[in-house]
């Protein structure tokens, strides 16, 4: 069933993992024209071909950029094809470790990919949305932004993105641009061992792991015209797990 997003243009950053692919499928099903960005060119091309075969309008942009200039170049490629960007979805996953075990390079990578890159994408895309009087920004994060043990570098980046999302939502609210965060819980993966899957599910109130489609459905709602009265918010898609934490705003 198609939503009221028909004709819009969406840039999905890091569309080359399971969640990114699910978001692309969800938005394509709503009639959104897509630009898929990510480092894995082969996986992007395969996804683009799959979507095009279903009638979607789609382009792939192979990039692992975290620097401002390279990100502006990637955004320019999308605008050259479509003329505008109405929806920006920033999806990013990162490994974490205990603070003393983190190398200098890993700290830099966590902050670059988890905070600097989305910041630069926002700077490159949001001004055009504000000028047009419409925009939807959805940043995908996870529960590690709350500051869980052994997640120091990722928690620093994720909590920074949380603050950035709220600040930008207030700055852009009068211009028809909404900015929100989807916070994932434990999402099932084909590589997750069965024993680990069962253990993780036991700690979730609904007693199952999330799926990429669960995350994509939340993104689809926040990317739609009908979510225009929702901005600066954090939508937890975690099977109730966030309710265990004292701070889950």
Swiss-Prot record:
Report the InterPro entries cross-referenced here.
Answer: NAD(P)-bd_dom_sf, SDR, SDR_fam
Report any Pfam family annotated for this entry: adh_short_C2
Q: In which pathway does it act?
A: Xenobiotic degradation; toluene degradation
Q: What induces it?
A: Induced by toluene.
What GO terms describe the biological role, i.e. biological process, of this protein? toluene catabolic process
Q: Which PANTHER family match?
A: 3-OXOACYL-(ACYL-CARRIER-PROTEIN) REDUCTASE, 3-OXOACYL-[ACYL-CARRIER-PROTEIN] REDUCTASE FABG
Q: Which family does it belong to?
A: Belongs to the short-chain dehydrogenases/reductases (SDR) family.
Q: Quote the subunit structure annotation.
A: Heterotetramer composed of 2 inactive BbsC subunits and 2 active BbsD subunits.
What function does this protein fulfil? Involved in an anaerobic toluene degradation pathway. Catalytically inactive subunit, which is probably required for the structural and/or regulatory integrity of the catalytic subunit BbsD. This subunit cannot bind NAD(+) or substrate.
Q: What is this protein called?
A: (2S)-[(R)-hydroxy(phenyl)methyl]succinyl-CoA dehydrogenase subunit BbsC
From what organism does this protein derive?
A: Thauera aromatica
